[in-house]
């Protein structure tokens, strides 16, 4: 990686803050010794919140520094996409972590997933990218914002799905003993998935309007658009199954994770192996 790029020190600093938040979150839920009392101080949660907020601010500075350096926002290359997603996922999770104390232990699931992106972005070169004329469109901003909300809500659902799955083992029951029952966690996870479906639907609509303005067609069934539709369909089917049948919590959690994996591949895989006209749901 080119260490001379202005955004790199800020990127490293932001990821370091996320790493500290991850380690503190894990330290906070893990029992210190056998027979430890069930009630523990939650002071560590304030440290996690502070580190996450700091990471979001530092990544915002990194994005701003790159914007000034290359003249456009982080919408084109995989390096830019990963950096902007690390910022938006962190921002939305900070808000959820702050407003919903009951889901805070799920940070030990969510933050390592974010660190997959963090490790990935550090392997890429921060070369300047070309900003195509089709991106000078106000609908692009709507499409981008809705997409970021969609992925962040999915990630919050994945955190709770991980709790449901890990509670099938003793270590998970000990780590997440302060969280509500599986029934409540499952309901909250699927509420996030319902919201994700709303934002996914709006994102596809905004993307279609943008495509009409940019390329003269609403939908072309290229690899990216097909993958995006299949993700939407998989999410809708998952919600239908969850609402129509008595699904065991283990299966429920696996469905949520499967939906996220498909969305992850659509965001970070398909755009870069497809000859589609645009780079993806940035």
Q: What is each PLM-predicted segment?
A:
Residues 2-5:
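Intrinsically disordered terminal tails
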Residues 7-34, 42-130, 144-169, 184-214, ...:
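Hydrophobic cores of alpha-helical transmembrane segments in multi-pass integral membrane proteins
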Residues 134-145:
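Acidic/Ser/Thr-rich, low-complexity mid-to-C-terminal regulatory regions of eukaryotic proteins
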Residues 171-183:
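Juxtamembrane inter-helical linkers in multi-pass membrane proteins
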């Amino acid at each position: 990686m080119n260490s001379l790029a202005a955004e790199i020190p800020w990127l490293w600093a932001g990821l370091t803050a996320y790493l500290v938040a991850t380690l503190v979150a894990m330290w906070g839920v893990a029992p210190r010794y056998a027979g430890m009392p069930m009630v523990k101080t939650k002071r560590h949660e304030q440290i996690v919140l502070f580190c996450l907020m700091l990471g979001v601010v530092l990544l915002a500075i990194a994005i701003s520094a790159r914007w000034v350096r290359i003249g456009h926002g982080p919408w084109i290359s995989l390096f830019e996409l990963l950096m902007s997603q690390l910022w938006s996922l962190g921002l939305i999770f900070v808000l959820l972590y702050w407003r919903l104390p009951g889901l805070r232990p799920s940070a030990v699931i969510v933050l390592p997933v974010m660190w997959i992106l963090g490790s990935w972005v550090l392997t890429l070169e921060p070369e300047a990218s070309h900003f195509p004329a089709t991106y000078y469109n106000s609908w692009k901003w709507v499409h981008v914002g809705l997409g970021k909300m969609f992925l962040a809500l999915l990630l919050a659902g994945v955190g709770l799905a991980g709790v449901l799955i890990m509670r099938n083992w003793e270590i998970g029951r000990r780590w997440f003993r302060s969280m509500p029952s599986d029934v409540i966690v499952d309901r909250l996870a699927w509420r996030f998935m319902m919201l994700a479906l709303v934002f996914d639907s709006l994102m596809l609509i905004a993307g279609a309007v943008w495509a009409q303005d940019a390329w003269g067609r609403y939908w072309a069934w290229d690899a990216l658009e097909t993958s995006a539709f299949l993700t939407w369909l998989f999410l809708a089917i998952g919600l239908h199954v969850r609402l129509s049948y008595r699904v065991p919590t283990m299966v429920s959690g696996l469905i949520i994770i499967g939906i996220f994996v498909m969305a992850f591949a659509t965001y970070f895989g398909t755009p870069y192996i497809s000859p589609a006209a645009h780079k993806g749901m940035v």
